[in-house]
């Protein structure tokens, strides 16, 4: 099966950036600034090219980023250097985070990064890793597509995105002619089931407008 590294290497940082409308990013950043505090130690998990890491750091937030794609991290580091902002970027996998216990007060995991883990056991590992590196009373905020949005894409006639199911709840798309890595389709019920297996102190799952479009928002507190 195609890996995330292969997809992002082929799509490239610039190609990925073109997939996100500036207005979406602006609204999402505004939301993040409301839920995060500058005194917190924050991890941007699956940070990509630093779409949120860099502007949050510019705004005075204590944040660092982790991603599994070397080419996306290269752009993030170069952009941060150009902006003269010291940000720590690390290559790594969310199923085995290279951090000590209780390293962060908050974790954000944006776009569709979490559901690129197509096996439930890997998703459980990632959630447990988030809890491990969070401080007591810390939280993780995960954003994934709303189920109705994904199923609509399965029927879309858009020329830039074509999606199809490949097994169970896993979908694969072709984006701008590039075969994307598969994604696991979660709805509110399946996400709740996953959380009950991980057993955080508290969690909340909602489907609401985020960045000007319907998204599934997942909160998890240690």
Stretches with model-predicted labels:
Residues 95-106:
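A short acidic, Gly/Pro-enriched loop at the edge of an enzyme's catalytic core
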């Amino acid at each position: 099966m195609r890996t995330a590294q292969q997809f992002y290497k082929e799509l490239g940082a610039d190609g990925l950036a073109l997939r996100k409308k500036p207005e979406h990013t602006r609204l999402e950043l505004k939301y993040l600034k409301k839920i995060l505090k500058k005194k917190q130690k924050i991890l941007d998990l699956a940070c990509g090219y630093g779409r949120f890491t860099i502007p949050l750091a510019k705004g005075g937030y204590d944040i660092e980023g982790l991603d599994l794609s070397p080419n996306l991290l290269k752009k993030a580091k170069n952009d941060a250097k150009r902006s003269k902002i010291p940000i720590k970027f690390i290559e790594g996998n969310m199923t085995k985070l290279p951090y000590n216990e209780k390293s962060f007060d908050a974790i954000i995991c944006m776009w569709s990064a979490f559901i690129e883990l197509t096996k439930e056991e890997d998703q459980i590992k990632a959630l447990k890793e988030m809890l491990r590196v969070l401080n007591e009373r810390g939280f993780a905020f995960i954003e994934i597509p709303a189920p109705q949005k994904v199923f609509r894409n399965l029927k879309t006639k858009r020329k830039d995105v074509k999606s199809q199911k490949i097994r169970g709840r896993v979908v694969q798309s072709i984006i701008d002619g590039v075969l994307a890595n598969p994604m696991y389709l979660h709805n509110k019920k399946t996400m709740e089931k996953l959380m009950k297996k991980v057993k955080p102190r508290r969690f909340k799952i909602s489907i609401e407008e985020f960045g000007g479009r319907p998204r599934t928002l997942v909160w998890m507190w240690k």
